[in-house]
Design a protein with these regions (language model features):
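Extended, Lys/Arg-enriched charged tracts that mediate electrostatic binding to polyanionic substrates
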Residues: 1-10
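Domain-scale recognition of functional cores that engage charged ligands
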Residues: 9-15, 24-356
Length: 357
């Protein structure tokens, strides 16, 4: 099972065509908040008397669709006594986003049990029975939803790695399993931009061209002619590129002069092949109010840039596609002065699209 979010920015130099920033295949957050925020903004428009404008806010059923995806996976496991496991940290700052999903699962399917466990819980109390089912606290686990486990800090000891291996070896449906987890790496994004790669997965020329139009140029940094050329491009014009490692969770990328400094440090080091050099996207500016805890009241009208996220769910079994659908959308807005758009870090805000055409 895969719950993903593909993120896009408009490229000003290409007539504001949407360009893919990245795709997230593990712990793609804010799927529930995006639905709640859409309903909130509809309510605000109604209270302010802008009844005719409500239709300009597109429906967003991301929360319901995500919950239905988990229920579908739970049913495929074919054991009504089994539970869906949310893998979390001991302290989870984004717990509200997770709880909405849990509550929606219970609302749509009261029979479905949801439990929250940590890596440490799995390591200490989890085990595989003779059918390779994952059992913890006498409960069989049918679906594992990874909300953690995507950064090295989540694996401080071998205990966490052993717990991850136990879960991967189990018959539980993983969201995602290790294969889908690795698909979200930046090197995979780079490979998909190469000529002939999309043709391995798509056959219709129009679809191939539409997908390829969303790509920006991405360069590998291997020790070959192309890699050396990419290094020189970054050194000569660092403001036009983003340097990205194989990391998730935000705050890992390099921009502007940091690109040059990092490239100088590792241009002769084998570590450089673990990075990609991505053409930078310069989105158009719009005006908006950014409301944040502890911020000015009332908030000032400021320049913002907005990133679109499209959610999707994929469920497959033995090579057969059972569910493959777009489930919802998200807008994250931030100051153009901020390179990262982290919501929890306070450098961005959740937003909604308002359609004009």
């Amino acid at each position: 099972m895969l719950h993903l979010r593909s993120d896009y920015l408009m490229q000003s130099s290409s007539n504001n065509v949407l360009k893919q920033v990245e795709f997230n295949t593990i712990a793609a957050s804010f799927g529930s908040f995006s639905t709640i925020l859409t309903e909130y903004n509809r309510y605000i428009l109604q209270e302010l008397g802008y009844h005719d404008n409500i239709k300009n806010l597109p429906q967003n059923n991301g929360l319901r669709n995500l919950a239905q995806g988990f229920i579908q996976a739970w049913r495929l496991y074919n054991n009504e006594d089994a539970a869906i496991l949310f893998l979390t940290l001991d302290v989870t700052y984004n717990i509200s986003d997770q709880r909405w999903i849990e509550f929606e699962i219970k609302r749509l399917s009261p029979r479905t049990k949801v439990v929250r466990k940590t890596f440490n819980d799995i390591y200490k109390r989890g085990q595989l029975n003779n059918k390779h089912e994952l059992v913890i606290d006498n409960t069989i686990i049918s679906v594992i939803y990874f909300r953690e486990g995507y950064v090295p800090d989540h694996y401080p000891t071998n205990c966490e790695w052993d717990a991850r291996l136990m879960m991967e070896r189990s018959t539980a449906i993983k969201c995602p399993d290790i294969k889908f987890h690795l698909v979200g790496q930046k090197k995979v994004q780079q490979e998909l931009t190469k000529p002939g790669v999309l043709e391995l997965f798509l056959t219709e020329t129009a679809k191939i061209e539409a997908v390829r139009e969303a790509f920006v140029n991405i360069h590998g940094l291997e020790f070959d002619e192309n890699g050396d050329k990419a290094v020189q491009m970054a050194l000569s014009n660092p403001k036009m590129y983003v340097l990205k490692p194989q990391r998730e969770g935000g705050g890992n990328n390099y921009y502007d002069n940091d690109v040059k400094e990092m490239m100088l440090k590792m241009k002769d080091c084998k570590d450089r092949s673990g990075y990609i050099l991505m053409e930078r996207i310069f989105p158009p500016l719009s005006m908006g109010y950014m409301i944040s805890a502890g911020g000015p009241n009332p908030p000032p009208l400021i320049d913002i840039v907005s990133e679109l996220g499209i959610y999707g769910i994929l469920i497959s079994e033995s090579g057969n596609i059972i569910m493959n659908k777009q489930t919802g959308h998200l807008i994250r807005s931030k100051s153009p002065k901020s390179n990262e758009g982290g919501i929890l870090a306070g450098s961005g805000a959740l937003d909604c699209p308002y359609l004009l055409d």
